[in-house]
Amino acid sequence: MNFNQILGTVLDTVKQSAGKVNKPSESTADTITKVGGGAALVGLLSMVLGKKGGSSLTKIGSLAALGSIAYQAYQSYQKNQAQSTDLSPNQFEQTKHSEEERSNVILRTMIAAALSDGVLDENEKAMIEQEGQNQPEFQQWLSAELSQPISVTQIAQLVGNDVALASQVYLAARLVCQELSRKEIVFLAQLAEALNLDDKLVEQLEQQAGF
């Protein structure tokens, strides 16, 4: 599976969906089902995430946009530090993680954030089972992630001491948790702590995202 492509398609689908008004006789689920196969599975995942994040997720139409917001937040954070070092975007992004690994952990975190205050409803589960018949590997992976989302501890282990990726991961989760229910607040607090993000950096990430 190409997680970079999947994440990019999910972000783009959510962004496009937010700018459209469905036909009165056609629900989002109906539209997705007509696509079929793997594309429908990506559409279903977009629907699950978009339902939680709403307009917030339209701010990041790509992994590059997510990285740009995280970099701007880190720059603002660094300016307020006693010993600050100006980093270029390339220096900030220097990481041992491949783009595929970054996309994987960001996508898994977004799913965990979306499910932090509830579970997938039965209709959505049934649609995933039905539409995944043509792409069993992706269907199996998605079903597993939705049934047992990644924990904040596991996320932190995958991220390691990569500040750029940690910032992007937190930012992606925050954009999904638009409503900030009690359980979402707890999830985000635990995520920030597990990622070892400074409170002031978290504040800058939220400000740059428009919260």
Region roles according to the model:
Residues N2-T109, N123-F211:
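Small-residue-enriched hydrophobic alpha-helices in membranes
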Residues I111-A113:
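Primarily EF-hand calcium-binding motifs
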